[in-house]
């Protein structure tokens, strides 16, 4: 077993060797290096064919028509293109958008930008377990609501939203529904031929494909229109200009093909490992599960350890690559906005750790993790005056701390 152990698969994944090997065939002179938009020679035709194959592989995993897949530079761009693109196109119908407080920053900050441009956004607070109350969502819908953006799986706590029911609610009212599926694709079944979802964002690097490539699903029936945010040569049916990065697209396609074949057995394996991890640490005193095991993705476990500083815990766990909050926000020392939205106090939010498991995680690594976490929590609490006071029965909430 090699240290450190990587348990941050929700931040990114290593490229699968099968994917890397495939990508190498599309880079050099003796490979398929052409521009898929070059229609006048074989180099272009071969590149275009490779892109078509990848588009098919992606659409097959999610039950879409290949013509509904638009390649982007990643899920952040897909979220931007979906939300800004739909808002700009349909603004004559209304200027009201609904999302939730626990969305990824790529959705929240896009909505904030639209607010600056005159749109009105309602941010729904989730229930304590992270699930959106559908009655609240319904109550927030208005005649001028044009777009709802609610994610499938939360990147920090792993809870799964009921996108099927939300889709039905939106379709019945003629509201466009966008789903950020970055964390769910390849981990939960998605069938867009059945779901009433109009726009869906995907990433390559969360499921063993390369970074820098993603896709946006744009429904054809009933047809959804979006305004391009990137202008140029009119690639991707005018929705996203820019020369297609064939090697990255092929890599994403291959990653989606592999995950389609292996998803069922792999998710059962990961669910078993996640449960093993939780069962190994859940009897530690003052430990809290964030999210919902029953309604959660099989690969994410987010836990708070009361009376332990999150940063000191991460340092103590230096043999584990884990995160507190998401990679996109862990650079700041602010407690996780997702956990705060669940109604958690700052102290508990600060002591949270996200374990996210993946394709190369082993049982041996999980057992090592359990042992290390138990020892580290014990050691850090021995050093903590707060823990001592808690054990003596002092109500820490009633203490008035002196501010320096």
Curated annotation (Swiss-Prot):
Active site (catalytic residues): 328
Pathway(s) of this molecule: Cofactor biosynthesis; iron-sulfur cluster biosynthesis
Key words of the record: 2Fe-2S, Cytoplasm, Iron, Iron-sulfur, Metal-binding, Pyridoxal phosphate, Transferase
Cofactor requirement: pyridoxal 5'-phosphate
Binding site for pyridoxal 5'-phosphate: 75-76, 155, 183, 203-205, 243
Residues at which [2Fe-2S] cluster binds: 328
Keyword Transmembrane in record: no
Gene Ontology biological process: [2Fe-2S] cluster assembly
Main location: cytoplasm
PROSITE patterns: AA_TRANSFER_CLASS_5
Gene3D superfamilies listed in its UniProt record: Aspartate Aminotransferase, domain 1, Type I PLP-dependent aspartate aminotransferase-like (Major domain)
Transmembrane segments: none
Name of one Pfam family that matches: Aminotran_5
Enzyme's top EC category: transferase
Entry keyword annotation includes Iron-sulfur: yes
Biological role stated in the UniProt entry: Master enzyme that delivers sulfur to a number of partners involved in Fe-S cluster assembly, tRNA modification or cofactor biosynthesis. Catalyzes the removal of elemental sulfur and selenium atoms from cysteine and selenocysteine to produce alanine. Functions as a sulfur delivery protein for Fe-S cluster synthesis onto IscU, an Fe-S scaffold assembly protein, as well as other S acceptor proteins. Also functions as a selenium delivery protein in the pathway for the biosynthesis of selenophosphate.
The protein's assembly and partners: Homodimer. Forms a heterotetramer with IscU, interacts with other sulfur acceptors.
Name of the featured protein: Cysteine desulfurase IscS
Species assigned in the record: Salmonella paratyphi C (strain RKS4594)
Gene of this entry: iscS
């Amino acid at each position: 077993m090699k240290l450190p152990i990587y348990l941050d698969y929700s931040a990114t994944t290593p490229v699968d060797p099968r994917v890397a090997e495939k990508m190498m065939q599309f880079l050099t002179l003796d490979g398929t290096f052409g521009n898929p938009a070059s229609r006048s020679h074989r180099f272009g035709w071969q590149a275009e064919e490779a892109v078509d194959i990848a588009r098919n592989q992606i659409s097959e995993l999610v039950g879409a028509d290949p013509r509904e897949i638009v390649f982007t530079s990643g899920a952040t761009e897909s979220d931007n293109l979906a939300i800004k693109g739909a808002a700009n196109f349909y603004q004559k119908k209304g200027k009201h958008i609904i999302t939730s407080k626990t969305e990824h920053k790529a959705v929240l900050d896009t909505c904030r930008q639209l607010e600056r441009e005159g749109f009105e956004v309602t941010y729904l607070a989730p229930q304590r377990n992270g699930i959106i109350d559908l009655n609240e969502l319904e109550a927030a819908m208005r005649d001028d609501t044009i777009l709802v953006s609610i994610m499938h799986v939360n990147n920090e706590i792993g809870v799964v939203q009921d996108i099927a029911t939300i889709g039905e609610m939106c379709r019945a009212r003629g509201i466009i529904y966008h789903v950020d599926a970055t964390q769910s694709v390849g981990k939960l079944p998605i069938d867009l031929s059945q779901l009433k979802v109009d726009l869906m964002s995907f990433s390559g690097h969360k499921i063993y494909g390369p970074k820098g490539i993603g896709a946006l699903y744009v429904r054809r029936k009933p047809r959804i229109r979006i305004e391009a945010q990137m202008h140029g040569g009119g690639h991707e049916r005018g929705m996203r200009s820019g020369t297609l990065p064939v090697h990255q697209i092929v890599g994403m396609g291959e990653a989606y093909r592999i995950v389609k074949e292996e998803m069922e057995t792999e998710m059962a394996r990961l669910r078993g490992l996640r449960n093993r991890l939780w069962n190994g640490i859940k009897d530690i005193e003052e430990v809290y599960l964030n999210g919902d095991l029953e309604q959660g993705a099989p690969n994410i476990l987010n836990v708070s350890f009361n009376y332990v500083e999150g940063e000191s815990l991460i340092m103590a766990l230096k043999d584990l690559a884990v995160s507190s909050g998401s990679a996109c926000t862990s650079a700041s020392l602010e407690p996780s906005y997702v956990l705060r939205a669940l109604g958690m106090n700052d102290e508990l939010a600060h002591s949270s750790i996200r374990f996210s498991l993946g394709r190369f995680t082993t049982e041996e690594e999980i057992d090592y993790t359990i042992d290390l976490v138990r020892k580290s929590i014990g050691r850090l609490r021995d050093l903590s005056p707060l823990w001592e006071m808690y054990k003596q029965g002092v109500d820490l909430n009633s203490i008035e701390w002196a501010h320096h």
